Amino acid sequence: MTLTAKQMGMKDTTFKNAHGLTSAKHISTPKDMAILARRLIYDFPEYYNLFGRNSVNVLGRTLYNTNRKFLSQYNGSDGIKTGFTSSAGFNLAASAKRGNKRIIGVVFGSSSVSLRNKRMTELLNIGFANSKENVAFTSLKKLSLYPNIINILGENSLLKVSKEPVKRPLI
């Protein structure tokens, strides 16, 4: 998994297990998770719809999506993945699409689900308000709301990236 991650450009990620629970040196960054999210959306569109479902029935049992609250609260939200461990906190990689714009955001280390969802809402709102269609990946600017975050504007997307490679345990 780590080799594949590196090949995708996830330079600061090391996978130590497939389930994502805390393990020594099992780490990633918001930037790397955004790269993974983008690859998931665009490289595997036939599977991406699975991440936007509120629930699924498997063998007569209903399994609920862990990000269904965010999906139902944010206009255009269509995925992707939540996570939590004691060491990593509450995390979310999310994507939303409005018209021709798709914004991907990643929040690591929140102290609660509600704070995580609030931060993600703020990030996606900033993305939709500030991104332009067909802009090359060259424009960097600081966000005063999150001084340790930069944004990279790109064609139909806004990638939120930590200025420093803050590594956190994966969940």
Protein language model features and the residues they cover:
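Beta-lactam-recognizing serine transpeptidase/beta-lactamase-like catalytic domain environment
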Residues: 1-11
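Short, conserved loop-to-beta-strand elements that form functional interface hotspots
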Residues: 18
